Regions:
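A cross-family glycoside hydrolase active-site/sugar-binding cleft signature
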Residues: 8, 39, 164, 191-193, ...
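Conserved, mostly hydrophobic/aromatic
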Residues: 29, 266, 291, 309
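Conserved SAM/AdoMet-binding glycine-rich loop
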Residues: 5-12, 187, 199, 292-339
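Canonical Radical SAM [4Fe-4S] cluster-binding loop centered on the CxxxCxxC motif
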Residues: 252-289
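Flexible loop/turn segments at secondary-structure boundaries
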Residues: 13-16, 45-46, 169-172, 198-200, ...
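Glycine-rich beta-alpha loop elements in corrinoid/cobalamin-binding modules
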Residues: 4, 12-56, 113-241
């Protein structure tokens, strides 16, 4: 069965765990019986660069040669907990992998690492540069990877292709891929969501400033709008995340890490730099009992080694519940310490 929608996680962000937002959308789509596919082009694209021959740049240094020789060994080590017993071995493995990625980026005037993407010619904070990235997808560092990958995706004839744009380090690659899709199929419906997209929408008053390139801008939680677009107006929205469409064993972590969000927005909302307050986002928490139940269910289904609570700040109520009632899986997150 052809998927009605293909959801894409674009490069570049840390490839340590599945993206929480797309996992939540996947859970909603699955609960409503809507065919979908998830493509983590961030993970796939970075692995493509790491395992590809190092571009010739006139520099033939020993570090790059060593990194290339041990690339598979280093990738395996980062997925095996043993290397984390030695800080120096871990640091060397990460440095060697970053060396290969950095050299690949240098050929395109890109400052690239496992966590960042900076183009010396284009900036993600200028709409004109984003449009330029869309107009010239062949100039993107990841083009040799995403061109055939997206060609195959288009052959599945999805009704929509959606991109989850959360960080500035993803913006130029997102628009390059959107531009490629527009070239191959001008009629393909494209949806753009994610936290960075939400911030832009608040600035522009929810106006689609990329009309003609992007069909739909989704600000905030995407479940309701996505179901409406897919003709499921009365579908289930409050559903747990679904990680079964993600290659959970391919991420660069010693154990499977599952991100989980216990609330939308932030319970504190008083930090001077808070985007939730600036954007007028509501605080919509799950009940502690529901959080515990969903975490226990996910633990039984996926057998993760770690749960990452991705809230801006984990609330005292959730902390109390999880310390008194173990979800069965180690967990961590960030919270506010109040004197």
């Amino acid at each position: 069965m052809h998927p009605k929608i293909i959801l894409i996680h674009p490069p570049v962000s840390k490839p340590a765990e599945p993206p929480a937002g797309l996992a939540k959308l996947a859970g909603c789509l699955h609960a409503n019986g809507i065919g979908h596919e998830i493509i983590d082009t961030n993970l796939e694209g970075l692995l493509y660069l790491i395992t590809s021959p190092v571009p010739e740049t006139g520099e033939n240094d020993r570090w790059t040669a060593r990194a290339g020789k041990h690339r598979e060994e280093n990738l395996s080590a980062l997925r095996d907990g043993k290397i984390y017993q030695s800080r120096s071995r871990y640091q060397r493995a990460v440095a060697d992998i970053n060396r290969l990625i950095s050299r690949a980026g240098k050929a395109y005037s890109i400052d690239l690492s496992l966590a960042d993407y900076r183009d010396s010619r284009l900036t993600p904070v200028k709409s004109g540069d984003l449009l330029k990235a869309a107009e010239t997808p062949q100039n993107n560092l990841f083009y040799p990877y995403f061109a055939p990958r997206l060609e195959n995706a288009l052959k599945e004839n999805p009704e929509f292709i959606g991109f989850s744009l959360n960080y500035l380090s993803q913006a130029l690659c997102t628009f390059a891929m959107i531009g490629f899709i527009r070239r191959r199929n001008p009629r393909q419906k494209i949806v753009l969501g994610g936290s960075l997209t939400t911030s832009w929408a608040k600035i522009t008053g929810n106006k689609n400033v990329f009309g003609g390139l992007i069909d739909e801008i989704v600000a905030g939680a995407g479940e309701k709008r996505l179901l409406d677009l897919l003709g499921c107006q009365d579908g289930k929205i409050d559903t747990p995340p679904d990680y079964r469409s993600f290659p959970v064993h391919d991420y660069l972590s010693p154990v499977t890490i599952l991100p989980f969000c216990t609330a939308r927005g932030c319970y504190w909302r008083q930090c001077s730099f808070c985007p939730e307050k600036a954007e007028g986002s509501l605080y919509l928490p799950l009940s502690p009992a529901r959080v515990l139940s969903q975490l226990q269910t996910l633990g039984g289904q996926m057998h993760p080694g770690l749960i990452h609570l991705v809230d801006n700040a984990v609330s005292p109520a959730i902390l109390k519940t999880l310390t008194q009632n173990s979800p069965g899986v180690p967990w961590y997150g960030f919270t506010r310490i109040t004197p």
